[in-house]
Amino acid sequence: MKRVITYGTFDVLHYGHINLLKRAKALGDYLIVALSSDEFNAIKNKKSYYTYEQRKMILEACRYVDLVIPENDWDQKIDDVKKYQADIFVMGDDWEGKFDFLKDYCEVVYLPRTPDVSSTQTKAHLQEVTK
């Protein structure tokens, strides 16, 4: 079984996220999503609209996702790749090169982002339409 792992906050899940998850799953048989915890988001000075538990529930309902695990810090990736026996590490190409150190442990793939969509844009648009 080929295992794929990806990381993210996945707040206000949108079709760009779904596209990434679909393409990541297509690279293997089992997709693991490491989801940024609320505490880790605070360290990154990010505030999610949905809590970790809510975002986890949403991701678990996605047919492409097999397992959701918490992402608690920047340094857990090597341990996660080993623990979950990941064959492929996937991120959006906005992270190109940032995780090449994982090539000693698994294949690293940077997928092109879906054009014209981002969580930041979606949140800004939602604020505009609800004024």
Model-derived features: positions:
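Nucleotidyltransferase catalytic core that binds NTPs
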Residues: 1-131
